[in-house]
Design a protein with these regions (language model features):
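N-terminal beta1-alpha1 cap of cysteine-dependent amidohydrolase-like domains
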Residues: 1-75
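Active-site-adjacent pocket-lining segments in enzyme domains
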Residues: 72, 79, 87-108, 115-195
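Conserved Motif II region of HX4D acyltransferases
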Residues: 83
Length: 195
């Protein structure tokens, strides 16, 4: 997802909920003031379809977890926020192994903003997204490698920054507006882009 929750595009929601019954969602986030009330925005579109939905909120920057306790999730959401904090928290081999295992089991993985960025092999961090106000290319989880993504493309007016960043990498950067997304297969190939 190119922006923040909730998912407002009904085409995206239908693609997620029509594929299978969803009983459990795991949301990975990082600690910030008043984080708990915000979490409802990630799940509200699913609650209307699945009223008995179980949801777990995990903050890997403040707690240790046993990933084996979360192998039954149908949907995994990686939240948005401070991109560099998300990268520092979630870009590691253990989390990568968990996400790949869950994708192979058929789980849907949804990243919002920072959570979407870190799914790629390389991460484009816009100058609008860091305190140094510099273009940064960082390592990600490597779930896709034939492109990078730019989030909040429209609201950040990121066209010129994206063009400069593309000179630093040898693959294209796909722009995602706040309410658009790319849908990938489990090998990281683009199935569809929804604007």
């Amino acid at each position: 997802m190119g922006g923040n929750p909730p998912i407002k595009n009904h085409t995206i929601v239908k693609k997620i909920v029509s594929s299978r019954k969803i009983e459990r969602i795991i949301i990975f986030t990082v600690y910030r003031e008043n984080w708990q009330p915000y979490m409802k925005k990630y799940t509200e579109v699913f609650q209307s379809h699945f009223p008995n939905l179980n949801t777990d909120y995990l903050l890997l920057d403040t707690e240790q977890i046993n990933f084996d306790s979360y192998l039954d999730a149908e949907v995994i959401i990686i939240g948005g926020g401070n991109t560099e904090k998300y990268i520092a928290t979630y870009v590691n081999q253990e989390f990568k192994n968990y996400i790949k295992h869950m994708l192979n089991k058929g789980a849907k993985v949804i990243g919002f903003s920072a959570g979407a960025l870190l799914l790629g092999e390389k991460v484009y961090v816009s100058p609008n997204d860091n305190s140094d106000h510099q273009i940064k290319i960082k390592n990600g989880l490597g779930l896709f490698n034939q492109f990078l993504i730019s989030v909040h493309y429209d609201s950040w007016n990121d066209k010129a920054n994206k063009a400069r960043a593309e000179e630093l990498v040898d693959v294209p950067i796909i722009p995602l507006n706040d309410h658009s997304c790319v849908i990938l297969d489990k090998s990281g190939n683009i199935i569809e882009k929804i604007d």
